[in-house]
Regions:
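Primarily recognizes the serine-hydrolase "nucleophile elbow" in alpha/beta-hydrolase
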Residues: 179-255
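Short amphipathic alpha-helix adjacent to the substrate-entry channel of hydrolases
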Residues: 135-151
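Alpha/beta-hydrolase active-site loop
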Residues: 162-181
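Short beta-strand/loop motif that positions the catalytic acidic residue
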Residues: 292-294, 298
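C-terminal catalytic histidine-bearing segment of alpha/beta-hydrolase fold enzymes
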Residues: 303-310, 314-390
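Short beta-strand element of the alpha/beta-hydrolase
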Residues: 117-127
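N-terminal cap/lid segment of alpha/beta-hydrolase-fold proteins
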Residues: 61-115
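Bacterial Sec-dependent N-terminal signal peptides
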Residues: 16-70
């Protein structure tokens, strides 16, 4: 099983190295991340970009001398000067000193003015082939304006973070948020997840394993929940999930990327099944609203993976099916989409979480939708787009 894991991880690394384009939607700047780990710290206050979660220009954090007493009681929290937002940085959800087990949290109120209100929360999981990436890079959505809190997490990466370690970390982050929900004004009954690429796959694992501690997949026992952190009595259940171009079937993924013989030996098949999100559909009795967003010209994780997840989910939950959507980005690659497409997705994603975490059922949804993307800005993506339009 370990040998096949190495094959899968090598496959993912090759995929990640093939296309490292910047994106208006998802920022996966590998060079910046490498610089951050060289210094062994994240200089979050030096970022001059817009505050992508709140939609406000990034403002200076007020000094500790003028923080309210309420904020002092919380871990690493400060007010933004020009918004009704509290940000809590570098919180370790695993009770360790590992920076790969930390989260940042934005709350849509000033702590001393929140009264007893609790907010739904969306947790973002970054991509990077389980080999790199950072919680500092996340989609540019205006969740706070819709009174939805937002968190972005790190998780352990390979070689330390092999499957299912990163799943255990993500579940620990959810349990930490639920265990501290009253303190941080979070609604523990309305937690959403979203992620791209590797983070999209991890989002799918979470969506398909609600309330499951362990499973047998092709005669192999898989520890789903893990025992990371102090909040083991809390639930890691989520209520809604969005998967951006995460893979469905590890075997198909590696066969496509490395030319592997699809007729793997029996031992390898066990491993590929265990690391395939599609293997977990139907295992939980508590399916959640699930959205898939995938580009038709994705050469890293082909569009076929999004369709496989959509079809398997549809077939499995014929009765009492939760909300299910497949958003197809025609001509779209592995992210790196044009501004018009990105702006449309902002509305789609915000509406999805408002509808399912705030129970606003008046907001309509479409089970399938196609957005035609313009040619991407980078040369390789533009060539793909041009080929598709011939």
């Amino acid at each position: 099983m370990k040998a096949t894991l190495l094959i899968l991880l090598t496959c993912i690394l090759i995929s990640c190295s093939e296309e490292q384009e910047s994106s208006d939607l998802i920022d996966t700047d590998l060079n910046n991340y490498k610089e951050s780990i060289k210094t062994n710290e994240y200089d979050q206050d030096s970022n001059d970009e817009d505050d992508s979660v709140s939609g406000n220009k990034n403002t200076n954090i007020i000094s500790s001398s003028v923080k309210t007493d309420a904020i002092k009681e919380l871990q690493n929290c400060s007010d933004f000067n020009d918004s009704i937002t509290t940000v809590c940085k570098e919180i370790n959800y695993a009770s360790t000193d590992n920076t790969r087990q930390t989260l940042n949290l934005w709350i849509p109120c000033k702590i001393n003015e929140c009264s007893n209100k609790q907010y739904p929360v969306v947790i973002h999981i970054h991509g990077g082939g389980f080999a790199f990436g950072s919680k500092l890079k996340f989609p540019k959505y205006n969740f706070l304006k819709n009174e939805i809190a937002f968190a972005s997490i790190n998780y352990r990466l390979i070689p330390q973070g092999q499957f299912p370690v990163y799943l255990h970390d993500a579940k620990a982050a959810i349990r930490w948020i639920r265990g501290n929900s009253s303190k941080y004004h979070i609604d523990p009954n309305n937690i959403g997840i979203m992620g791209e690429s590797a983070g999209g796959a991890l989002t799918s694992y979470l969506a398909f394993t609600n309330e499951i501690k362990e499973l047998i997949i092709d005669d192999t026992k898989v520890n789903i929940e893990g025992n990371v952190g102090k909040y083991l009595n809390e639930s890691s259940k989520i209520q809604a999930a969005i998967n951006y171009f995460g893979h469905a079937d590890s075997k198909k993924f590696c066969s496509a990327k490395m030319g592997l013989d699809p007729n793997c030996n029996e031992k390898s098949t066990f491993c590929f099944a265990c690391t395939s999100p599609i293997s977990y559909i139907g295992k939980s009795s508590s399916p959640v609203p699930y959205m898939i967003i995938h580009g038709t010209n994705d050469t890293l994780v082909p569009y076929e993976h999004g369709k496989l997840l959509f079809e398997k989910f549809s077939e499995t939950y014929l009765k009492n099916q939760p909300e299910l959507s497949l958003i197809t980005i025609q001509n779209g690659g592995h992210g790196n989409w044009d501004d018009n497409t990105s702006n449309k997705l902002k509305d789609i994603n915000t509406n999805f979480f408002v509808r399912n975490l705030k129970n606003d059922k008046e907001i309509p949804y479409e089970k399938t939708k196609t957005i035609i993307s313009e040619c991407a800005k980078t040369k390789s993506s533009a060539n793909l787009c041009n080929e598709a339009m011939k």
